[in-house]
């Protein structure tokens, strides 16, 4: 049987194969371009010293430098160590700032990008067949569906909720990036190519592009003056001008009346031309949006059964619009009714391997499994007798949910404070975790022992997936794009949760140690100047033993 070195013979003694492998690794490294370059530089310096040591009198120059160093006062050593400590401290602070902002070490980045090519580039050894290159991995991760921005199915109302929060706290709950995505959504949902034929729709087309909220509201009133049945104008007023949910519901009811009338007209003539078909799609989007928001208004006003009925009717009437994730609104309303059998029926339909997952799907499934065992669950008892089948199923469901979105448990366990959810989320990211926990924390608290079971088991997921960026267990490897996108979606006063936690680069530890060591030397030099001078001379004798007699003579 051939060993790892390819000799085709058995090793003569135990451990010989390991020694041969180490020797082979050293030989390959010595054959690398950068190693050959270092050997060439060392050989050149040796030849330079051998050829020119007599003309240049290097030994005499070294002795002169040693004499100069031996005559320096303690103040010089103190100033030197203070300066070294200050410079290394500046480097440490800059490295820390660069790491916190960009997630990489500046020194390592410069070394890899600029210095490494100068000393020979990368090694020639081919990559392992099963591994992707860094560029391919990054491209694959960027192409994964988890890195796509999704509209938050449970997003709040700007006028009735987000604006009220800003009035009370003085903090802006939405980022410009998030609002810009919403503006793009509104243009896609509520406009079409035939808007130029209707003056009111032309005004609304401009309104959706406006950045100033007051300008948008003013444009909506202008559209209503031109056409009192402009459904999109009522939608804008309900979203942004209404300061209460009751006012928003009133506007949406007016939008529903106008939207149904326009939708029926579009249905009758949609086959006449592609423009009419595009208008029907737009009118369908408006009608679905209005009905969904009316159901959400009913949910917020306590009419939960009415809200559930409206959502079920909407899903039956427009089954092809499942990408709007109306089922997540339905799940939350059913959990509020504590209709757990109906929740399980919805999960059976949408928790399918062929459909996109979400935190709402995964954590609701885990909640139902935990509900069956949480009241009787005890870590001590489980440790003694082992887990039952139902407990194993609950723990596995929690591990599955945590693998999909590892940020959620800290919010459910109230280890991190919540903020208002953004209008868009990134699946598996902190933004999705905030949106889920904001609406579902009360449902976990309602089931006795569910949070206790989550607290005891959720961290076990990370032992199953030690390197989540490289390998997943039940899902794709965790995408690397979440942190950057979440920082764009979530407000600046919120501390974004990062997974996996990045280890501090080597040079941060190195500069911190160098700064501390030089500061300690400066303090010792200031307190014990004579002793530190003796120590410095001893170091010089160790570094340059040839010149030691001159050092002793000068001392």
UniProtKB/Swiss-Prot annotation:
Cellular component terms (Gene Ontology): membrane
Domain of life: Eukaryota
Provenance organism: Gallus gallus (Chicken)
This protein's name: Suppressor of tumorigenicity 7 protein-like
UniProt key word Transmembrane helix: yes
Spans through the membrane: 32-52, 76-96, 504-524, 531-551
Subcellular location: Membrane
Family: Belongs to the ST7 family.
Gene (name only): ST7L
Keywords of this entry: Membrane, Transmembrane, Transmembrane helix
InterPro entries on file: ST7, TPR-like_helical_dom_sf
Entries under PANTHER family matching the protein: SUPPRESSION OF TUMORIGENICITY 7 (PTHR12745), SUPPRESSOR OF TUMORIGENICITY 7 PROTEIN-LIKE (PTHR12745:SF4)
One Pfam family linked to the record: ST7
Main location: membrane
Lineage: Eukaryota, Metazoa, Chordata, Craniata, Vertebrata
Topological category with respect to the lipid bilayer: Multi-pass membrane protein
